[in-house]
């Protein structure tokens, strides 16, 4: 009887750690801003997803998830068996949102999307976008003038 309880506990533990399956052709991407873009002030980030659907957190339907936007963080550092954190570097969009407006301080920043399942965990295989690097420019900082060519002299 004791071994039966141990086996049941082991199965339940493995089920709790199991990741939700995602189609192998799922593609998560950032529509805007573009990689390398220079941005002034608050800006919109638009999320894109192919071959899966976007839903609210907690929805256990197959092939759907919700977005998490990583700001100056790397998806490689996430624990696949734990919920994706929710903090200023890991923004959670559990209402099924597909865009957000960010206001970041001047400087270089990275943005990366991760699709979370009903329990805010990473899918298997992971559905993660490429990183986008942007530079937020202070609107008060004057731009350097471009070098002007001298007009050719006529003879």
Predicted regions and their residues:
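Short beta-strand elements
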Residues: 125-145
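Short coil-to-beta strand junction motifs in C2/discoidin
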Residues: 59-67, 128
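Short amphipathic, basic-aromatic surface patches that mediate peripheral association
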Residues: 48-59
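Short, compositionally biased P/S/T/A/G/V-rich stretches that sit at domain boundaries
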Residues: 20-40, 141-155
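A glycine-anchored, Pro-Gly-centered beta-turn/N-cap motif
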Residues: 41, 65, 105-107
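Short acidic/polar inter-strand loop motif in beta-rich domains
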Residues: 76, 116-124
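A beta-strand/beta-hairpin structural motif
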Residues: 80-102
């Amino acid at each position: 009887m004791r071994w039966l309880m141990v086996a049941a506990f082991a199965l339940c533990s493995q089920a709790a750690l199991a990741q939700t399956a995602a189609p192998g052709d799922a593609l998560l991407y950032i529509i805007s801003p573009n990689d390398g873009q220079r941005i002034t002030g608050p800006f919109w980030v638009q999320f894109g997803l192919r071959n899966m659907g976007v839903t609210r957190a907690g929805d256990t339907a197959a092939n759907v998830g919700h977005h998490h936007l990583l700001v100056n963080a790397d998806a490689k550092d996430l624990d696949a068996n734990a919920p994706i954190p929710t903090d200023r570097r890991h923004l959670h969009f559990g209402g099924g949102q597909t865009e957000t407006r960010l206001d970041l301080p001047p400087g270089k920043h990275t943005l990366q999307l991760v699709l979370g399942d009903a329990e805010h965990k990473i899918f298997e295989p992971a559905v993660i976008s490429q990183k986008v690097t942007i530079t937020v420019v202070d609107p008060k900082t004057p731009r350097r003038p471009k070098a002007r060519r001298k007009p050719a002299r006529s003879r």
